[in-house]
Amino acid sequence: YGGIVPEVASREHLRVIIPVIQEALEEANCSLDDLEAIAATRGPGLTGALLVGYNTGKAIALSKKLPFLGVNHLEGHVRANWLVEETPPSFPALALVVSGGHTDLVFMEEDGKYERLGGTLDDAAGEAFDKVGRLLGLPFPGGPAVAKEALKGAVSSLKLPRSWLPGTANFSFSGLKTAVLHSIRKDSWSPEEIAWEFQESVVDVLAGKVEKFATELQAKEVLVAGGVASNQRLREELKSRITVPVRIPPPSLCTDNAAMIGAAASPRLSRGERTSLSEDVFSTNDWSVV
């Protein structure tokens, strides 16, 4: 389809949800009777797909009389950073959540406390990668395809815009996407050159914003999360620019996964928190729901 069709995605979730659960239990060498709690993504995201996983989780919790926790998908991405190092992050911390659907800058004064400083006003960074990949005739998903194409490129005469939005923690990538389209139509640069400069523009803005706010807020650590955090160029630039420790999960934990949802649910379970089975999914970006 060249992208995600919500109805198709929902039906595919429904088709594979039980086999995936069975496979996970087999790989972990356990059964549902060994579990102490159930956690499931509550949002944000595509409602049809969310409902499949969320309601399956609620059904298992109800049938096994287990505690249930609905998890904010974006918090899950941040908590993936707890899975890779023995020592927890230092606070206050600044988190960059950058994915196909979201690009948020979040301040964490303490563990579990989230303040969204800003986010994208239009396309998310990952969405921009996908759309530019499509413009360049690359396969979906565009993120890894554009990054691979950029490896063939180098500095050229092409200069794409950087949308800094001074004085804010917000991002905007729609203008950059339009500039790429105009560059393609001019037919003066190769796909590799365009991919390289596009990636440089995105990485420059993301790293620049993180550098600015990490300094201003005196963050002791920077946490990076989301599918775009798999981008090697972004990982290198953040670690090069930021003077405090930068945590980035391995690529396998940057893209959507269940481990990060468990990581987000675990401390809440320890605090005795529970999600009512009457609570529903949510589709919009809301950091107050954690």
Residue ranges and their predicted role:
Residues E110-K152, K177-T178, H182-S188:
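Glycine-rich phosphate-binding loop plus the immediately following alpha-helix
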Residues T41-G43, I60, S99, L223-N231:
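Glycine-rich beta-strand-to-loop/alpha-helix junction loops that act as flexible
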Residues V71-A93, A264:
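Conserved phosphate-binding catalytic cores of ATP/NTP-utilizing and phosphoryl-transfer enzymes
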Residues Y1-P44, H73, H77:
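N-terminal beta-alpha supersecondary unit
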Residues H77-R79, P249-V289:
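Glycine-rich phosphate-binding/hydrolytic loop that grips phosphoryl groups
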